Amino acid sequence: MAERGAHITTTSPLDDRPSIFEVVAQESLMAAARPALHHIVKVLAESNPARYGTLWRWFDELYTLLECLLQQHYLSWASASFSENFYGLKRVTLGKQVGQRNLARKEYWKSLLLLVLIPYLRIKLEKLVNSLREEEDYSIQNPTSFHKRCYKAILASYPFLKLGWEAWFLFYQLRYILWNGKHHSPLLRLAGVQLARLTMEDLRAMEKQEELTNTVSNVVSISQHIRSILKKALGAVTLSVSSSLSLGVFFLQFLDWWYSAENRETLKSLGNLPVPPPPIHFDLETYSPLLPKLRTVCPLCRKVRVNDTALGTSGYVFCYRCAYYYVKTHQRCPVSGYPTELQHLIKLYTPDG
């Protein structure tokens, strides 16, 4: 029994097939980079919404563009993604010719699209589903509308779609472990490549290629010279980004621990301070005619509030439906005018129900 499972943790010197621990480690590296950068941008946006609000709203698109530049650089230089190259792995075209080190053009573009596009679409789909669930919980959409039926179909099919996606990846990983499969991920199979370890010949070829790109011929045309400058600038940007990511790899583990649930509870217990006294309220009518005289009335619809919801940026309370639509449309508090996003809506539960 032990002999049959020995190949899971050990490899022969002649076998360049990486172990399951190597491929899982390189996948978790890029998976940890996005949440860490996302949290940094969130802190910056909350501290200065006017300056970093755009960066927060377009984080997914900017991160995808940055990742595209990074992966393009490593695929063209090392025939591997950033995380694969970090763990000493490379992508090999299935059935490649002897002596061919770089990826073929077809496999290169398929690898780049699958590395960049699939995570972006998955993040967008998860955000869409979470938004639809929130709108359905508070009955924001019209129940008789055509869009409502489409939303219900998406919400009903998403769990099965996610289950099938995860089962698809699990099947490939089990086949890679137990039956010596060539691919641990179906995305590699779709790209027409497989992972292998870097050899000394690969490292020497990468160094030689880097030297050739640094030496530019003196006799070139103007268009070639401009193209070379742009290529060098793009390479410098991607190299600086990759170097920064390499230095921050081990810092990501610290961030993962720092913002974990267990550590958050510990910090909360250490930082328990007495509740400050309530602020002194002046005559609200002198500076905000939008506020009603009765505290139980919503400032937007002028009716008794339903599903009390406060805005974390200003503290004013509205109906959930009124606050949701207003903040989604104007991105600010209707009373104070402070910049506000949907994540600043805080649902209140009163003792009287």
From Swiss-Prot:
Membrane topology reported for the UniProt record: Multi-pass membrane protein
CDD domains: mRING_PEX12
GO biological process: protein import into peroxisome matrix; protein monoubiquitination
GO function term, MF aspect, one: zinc ion binding
InterPro entries according to UniProt: PEX12 (IPR017375), Pex_N (IPR006845)
SUPFAM superfamilies: RING/U-box
Cystine bridges: none
Zinc in keyword set: yes
Cellular component terms (Gene Ontology): peroxisomal importomer complex; peroxisomal membrane
Keyword Cell membrane: no
Ranges in the topological domain labelled Cytoplasmic: 48-51, 135-139, 272-353
Subcellular location, record wording: Peroxisome membrane
Associated pathway: Protein modification; protein ubiquitination
Keywords noted in UniProt: Membrane, Metal-binding, Peroxisome, Protein transport, Transmembrane, Transmembrane helix, Transport, Ubl conjugation pathway, Zinc, Zinc-finger
Positions annotated as zinc finger (RING-type): 298-337
Binding site residues for Zn(2+): C298, C301, C319, C322
Peroxisomal matrix topological segments: 1-19, 77-104, 179-243
Transmembrane segments: 20-47, 52-76, 105-134, 140-178, 244-271
Chief place of localization: membrane
Pfam families listed in its UniProt record: Pex2_Pex12 (PF04757)
Entry text on domains: The three subunits of the retrotranslocation channel (PEX2, PEX10 and PEX12) coassemble in the membrane into a channel with an open 10 Angstrom pore. The RING-type zinc-fingers that catalyze PEX5 receptor ubiquitination are positioned above the pore on the cytosolic side of the complex.
Family: Belongs to the pex2/pex10/pex12 family.
Description of how the protein assembles with itself and partners: Component of the PEX2-PEX10-PEX12 retrotranslocation channel.
PANTHER family cross-referenced by the UniProt entry: PEROXISOME ASSEMBLY PROTEIN 12, PEROXISOME ASSEMBLY PROTEIN 12 PEROXIN-12
Cited function: Component of a retrotranslocation channel required for peroxisome organization by mediating export of the PEX5 receptor from peroxisomes to the cytosol, thereby promoting PEX5 recycling. The retrotranslocation channel is composed of PEX2, PEX10 and PEX12; each subunit contributing transmembrane segments that coassemble into an open channel that specifically allows the passage of PEX5 through the peroxisomal membrane. PEX12 also regulates PEX5 recycling by activating the E3 ubiquitin-protein ligase activity of PEX10.
Protein name according to UniProt: Peroxisome assembly protein 12-B
Organism expressing this protein natively: Xenopus laevis
